[in-house]
């Protein structure tokens, strides 16, 4: 055991609020930058109350849900055509019920995959596309060549397909599962996007028009499953061929899972207000946003340890980020970083009180999470956390030096550092620690594997697209858009479009990584995909994470706070 590990395992926990009086903090009189973030719109007394007054699920609803689960299992076992089985799987997944029927879904998809030699889907656009998407999502490779039958001799898609809106929509969604170099899927994406944009206002079926509009705003593959489930439950209710059993179970299950999440939110809110970090005026106070992100990554109730530790580490991480970005001087940040590298509190008395508070909160919470993992999972994860924190803070330190030195790095240099500074290697490693098979498996995340590299790079670039206007106004650190503008002389509009193109290309690489990263168990692959989906949710239309009173508020409230009305039973 090295010295840093020994320190982590034996160091006493320190109450940072015993050592720092935020009201008389000597830092307050100094000329410090401010993040200018608005106060949180979420009432912490209310959030804490969710621990004991959450959405309680009635006993009769639990019994009804069990009955309906049995009926759905019977549906999976009943004889049906392959397309009907695919559509059942699709609806179950989109309703957010896949965590209840993991075995049935896998058996159904493997059966369809094995029976593919007879080509039952051939010439049927919807069937071909749905089969392609669901099997690739499941980790079963289907070649892009299955779509050649819909192209002419020059490789163009037949314009007659534009009349088949349902098939077009399925092909559109399937195209986002493509890999780099799969030109047929690139053509499919461009073709279906153009056709659907020109057709959706004239679609007679309201439910189909609603689905098309929703998909064009953001494809299914890029959406957060838990948020999508809430939207789809309401949309599915309006469909003519809606299955009442699936709909009723989806509503009940959504509320039951939400009840679990609400209890966790309440307990986490109680912890957060004891840290003192919520009182720092320059930093973001975003506990509920952090929980929303953990819920995006791992909403399944069985991932409680992953969710809670991601929120705890993530909430502290946000304040550490703001400390580097807007608060600390270079000398202070160098001392902070060296203390993280030593994983020691010995020299932090040389730091100003506020940075001391942040360091001790980070140190304590990380050691506390490590001890919890030791208790619940049976292995020592603290060395893994220390490595991740060191890389995290060194990336922040580099950005601070760029900022204070007035240096604009090339896009590639910025991106390699930025994929770490975005924080997702640390957060995803936190999630991985909660589900790893054993201590030896923790070595798989150092050095950073491609799966983590590309998911984190995507989150960095998506974040940059959404936050660059606000951060430019604050005079904050550079973003990829500015680096590209400086490197090439491009306008901001051209640079923004370039970064969007880079995002699309890196999604293709990440899609392939999901097949190539066989050293990881499936939940961790999904964690990575979901982390990028969370980035799309928070940053697709601006800074929905830093600005709490934004468009994200409605979805967060519907997913985390408001249960679905069940109506008459």
Swiss-Prot record:
Q: How is the cofactor bound?
A: Binds 3 Mg(2+) or Mn(2+) ions per subunit.
Q: Which cofactor does it need?
A: Mg(2+); Mn(2+)
Positions binding Mg(2+) 3 in this chain are 463, 467, 471
* Family annotation (InterPro entries): Isoprenoid_synthase_dom_sf, Terpene_cyclase-like_1_C, Terpene_cyclase_plant_C1, Terpene_synth_N, Terpene_synth_N_sf, Terpene_synthase-like, Terpene_synthase_metal-bd, Terpenoid_cyclase/PrenylTrfase
CDD domains in the record, alphabetically? Answer: Terpene_cyclase_plant_C1 (cd00684)
Q: Where is this motif: DDXXD motif?
A: 321-325
Task: Cite the binding residues for Mg(2+) 1.
Answer: 321, 325
EC numbers for this chain: 4.2.3.82, 4.2.3.83, 4.2.3.81
Provide the function of this protein.
Answer: Catalyzes a mixture of sesquiterpenoids from (2E,6E)-farnesyl diphosphate in fragrance biosynthesis. Catalyzes the formation of alpha-santalene, beta-santalene, epi-beta-santalene and exo-alpha-bergamotene, as well as traces of alpha-farnesene and beta-farnesene. Also acts with (Z,Z)-farnesyl diphosphate isomer, producing alpha-endo-bergamotene, alpha-santalene, (Z)-beta-farnesene, epi-beta-santalene, and beta-santalene.
Query: What is the designated name of this protein?
Result: Santalene synthase
Q: Look up and give the organism this protein is from.
A: Santalum album
